[in-house]
From Swiss-Prot:
Gene: gltX
Motif 'KMSKS' region location, chain numbering: 257-261
Taxonomic placement: Bacteria, Bacillati, Actinomycetota, Actinomycetes, Mycobacteriales
Protein's name in the database: Glutamate--tRNA ligase
Enzyme class, UniProt record, top EC level: ligase
Keyword presence, Cell wall biogenesis/degradation: no
Length: 490
């Protein structure tokens, strides 16, 4: 690649299932590298498997990238010079490339059945599970005609080179597969439909992809891709072989790869809990890369400025939910309070949680919990006491704080608040401190815990005086009186 050529990377998932955090990590690294280099981020859908692919999963991929803010320069709903960007719409392109590969002798029709291949291995004293033996390379025209007359439907296989296949992996360094270690591989099904082994490198060539950043699990397929790229160059379809970078595996518990069965692998499960994009992307960036040894908290702009694929670590990265949560909490605290309020309202609305406060009061309540939550979903437990239909005194909290000692506290609090001239947090605080700390000589925890339980139903809530102000005089007094009845007469 010359200095004048632009980096072109691609993210090309198959639309199956729910977006996996490992998949999103791959998208993030590709996106960040494109933005860092001033290059192009191509989003391509590999939907050639009609039995597994679904429109629902396709739409989920679009939703995931949009929620995360990973915008694409070319791809679905955006277009671009090398479209279409869904492989299911590129069948004619693949048929043309196949015809050219066959005409040039780079590929051939293979008629052998798996049983025939295995039988030949056994007859030759080889391991029967070695895979295809390149037998059909040397068929005569008469043999091919005979197979066709039998009604056999051939697959198309690429003729692998007789040389070593090697590349300098941008993450792992030099990698070599010895000549003969990779057999001729199928480019099509017997039906003639193209396989991933054809369409993926073919699209990379036609879309002029310069760098392929993908998961380590795909490294064994790289020799086949190199060989096909070489053939595509020889027939005039490709201009270059892209540079490869194989990103480290994301692990779950122990040493096992994070699988779709692991709850933390589901991107939308994190969103449903209340992760914000900034927090999740920050954590995913750390799965194989770091901005600095002592600097784990950063935003996308910082990542883009610093990211180079050459700095990606080759060692597996373990998904640590606690660390992800901690980073998300930090990013929530960093949000402008107005921005946080909007996001919190949207999250609660999405999950059917309505807080019985007007807009101004909700904004004030949001500010109270912003530094007290890890994910947006935590706010519901802290704020639901504002809803009369959700308010209930927790029995454990009542047993702890609304015992005999609580009666005197509630009596004094009710007396002090009844005579309060204004219902604001500073005046509420002053009245209660005067009555309970000065008047009853109580320590703050003993003074205010019974009031907290009475007003909110729990021992954990937003700041007490501000909560009472937002709850309002009437509802606050009603709840304190009801709690006093629970305590009984002192």
């Amino acid at each position: 690649m010359t200095a004048t050529e632009t980096v072109r990377v691609r993210f090309c998932p198959s639309p199956t299932g729910t977006p996996h955090v490992g998949l999103v990590r791959t998208a993030l690294f590709n996106w960040a590298y494109a933005r860092h280099t001033g290059g192009t981020f191509v989003f391509r859908i590999e939907d050639t498997d009609a039995q597994r692919d679904s429109e629902e999963s396709y739409l989920a991929l679009l939703d995931a990238l949009r929620w995360l803010g990973l915008d694409w320069d070319e791809g679905p709903e955006v277009g671009g010079p090398y479209g279409p960007y869904r492989q299911s719409q590129r069948a004619e392109i693949y048929r043309d490339v196949l015809a050219r590969l066959l005409a040039a002798g780079e590929a051939y029709h293979a008629f052998s059945t798996p049983e025939e291949v295995e039988a030949r291995h056994v007859a030759a004293g080889r391991n029967p599970k070695l895979g295809y033996d390149n037998f059909d390379r040397h068929l005569t025209d008469a043999q091919r005609a005979a197979y066709l007359a039998e009604g056999r439907q051939p697959v198309v296989r690429l003729r692998m080179p007789d040389d070593d296949l090697a590349w300098n992996d941008l993450v792992r360094g030099p990698v070599t597969f010895a000549a003969g270690s990779v057999p001729d591989f199928a480019l099509t099904r017997a039906s003639g439909d193209p396989l991933y082994t054809l369409v993926n490198p073919c699209d990379d060539a036609l879309m002029k992809i310069t760098h392929v950043l993908r998961g380590e699990d795909l490294l064994p397929s790289t020799p086949r891709q190199l060989a096909l790229h070489q053939a595509l160059i020889r027939i005039g379809v490709a201009e270059r072989i892209p540079k490869f970078a194989h990103l480290p595996t994301v692990l779950g518990e122990g040493t096992k790869k994070l699988s779709k069965r692991d709850p933390q692998s589901n991107l939308f499960a994190h969103r449903d809990r209340g992760f914000i994009p900034e927090g999740l992307l920050n954590y995913l960036a750390l799965l194989g890369w770091s901005i600095a040894d002592d600097h784990d908290l950063f935003g996308l702009d910082e990542m883009v400025a610093a990211f180079d694929v050459a700095d990606v670590n080759s060692s597996p990265a373990r998904f640590d939910q606690k660390k992800a949560d901690a980073l998300n909490a930090e990013h929530i605290r960093m949000l402008d309070v107005g921005d946080f309020t909007v996001r919190l309202r949207d999250h609660l609305d999405t999950h059917g949680h309505h807080i019985a406060l007007d807009e101004a009061a909700f904004a004030a309540a949001a500010e109270l919990v912003q530094t007290r939550i890890v994910v947006l979903g935590d706010a519901w437990e802290l704020l639901k006491f504002f809803n009369d239909d959700q308010y209930v005194i927790d029995p454990k909290a009542a047993a702890k704080e609304l015992g005999p000692d609580g009666a005197a506290v509630l009596d004094a609090a009710l007396a002090a608040l009844t005579s309060a001239t204004d219902w604001t947090a500073p005046l509420i605080e002053a009245a209660l401190k005067d009555a309970l700390i000065e008047g009853l000589a109580l320590k703050p925890r003993k003074a205010f815990s019974p009031i907290r339980v009475a007003a909110t139903g729990t021992t954990v809530s937003p700041p007490l005086f501000e909560s009472l102000e937002l709850l309002g005089r009437d509802r606050s007094m009603q709840r304190l009186r009801a709690a006093r009845q629970l305590v009984g007469h002192a």
